[in-house]
Amino acid sequence: MKTSERAAGGSAAWPPAADWGERLVRGLLWLFSFLPLWLLHGIGSLTGRLIALIPNRQRRNALINLALCYPYTSDAELIRLRNRALREFGKTYLEIAPLWLRAPAQALALIREVRGAELLRQDDGRGLIVLSPHLGAWELAGLHLAAQGPTAIFYKPQKYLDDLIVGARRRSGATLAPITARGIRSLVLSLERGEAVGILPDQGPRGDKGAVFAPLFGRPAWTMVLVSRLARRSGARVIFMFAERLARARGFRIHCLPAPQDIDSADDLEAATALNLGIEHCVAVCPEQYLWTYRRFRDRPAGTPKVYTGGLSDRAALATAARLRSLAAASSE
């Protein structure tokens, strides 16, 4: 148990927005899509610096996450890493504009290198499950995967900008499978045909089914078990892939990594632990580019305290993380 704190091809469709806020976001995305990458990253980095200066929940949550995941790192280094992560956070959301709104070929031209490309080959006729964490430019990772051949993307419909996101992903040639029983059946069929399936593995599943608490950086994280079940049912291989953002807006480097052993285990905890270990291996390459602002530990084992609480200052965030670490250590004795 746990407790919890559209059109393919052509240009993106722009139906009337639900409110002026969404209209403004759409307009900014359209404007940003024309800007060069160096300017987008410059604006994004500046935005991240501003977020780091003003006490806010994003800043606090990122520091709590880092302090929980890197318990032996000094407070000063955690704050430095958090500030770097916020600058990368800003770049992530500025570069989404051209990735969504430019032609896929233009976005793919930003890829400078692919490491581990042999893992993407499907010479044996088996399906391929590609896990892309919220690391670097995950939208570009999805575009690269779709460019390799028939691809289905496991997709959570969004409250805002959903048609824009759907249209961008479909223009890449991918099909979208919603997070429903029907969507899961669609993924199974794709894998049985020897196609690729893309999944964001570090989203906290909703509800009490289809997930277990498994260690992520040594902390219990509510983790999906869908990947192991898909792999066992279809016989598909599993790998990890992400797009690292290169310095000075030089483009991106794709990394393909083998999945840890046991990721297809029939034991849900073993499989989820292996999945989270694979995420850790990816994050180790460029930890500042992980989405540390995401409330990954929002869902908690019953009887344990909430994570994202307390004051917004750095001192308060570090104190919250220290208290949680102390409680976890005491409960394990």
Explain the meaning of each model-derived region:
Residues A105-R112, K156, G173-I179, L216-G218:
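Short, flexible loop segments at the rims of nucleotide/cofactor-binding pockets, characterized by
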Residues A18, A52, L131, Y155-K156, ...:
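A generic secondary-structure micro-motif detector
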Residues K2-S132, A137, D162-G167, R171-G173, ...:
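Membrane-anchoring hydrophobic helices of lipid-metabolizing enzymes
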Residues R60, K156-K159, P220-M224:
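Active-site metal-coordination segments of metallo-dependent hydrolases
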Residues A105, E113-G116, L140, V166, ...:
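Short capping/connector residues at structural and topological boundaries
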Residues K2-R6, G10-P16, I54, R80-N83, ...:
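Non-catalytic C-terminal accessory region of glycerolipid acyltransferases
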Residues G27, N61, L140, L164, ...:
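Short Gly/charged-rich anion-binding patches and loops
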Residues D124-A181, R193, R206-V212:
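Catalytic core of membrane glycerolipid acyltransferases/transacylases, capturing the structured
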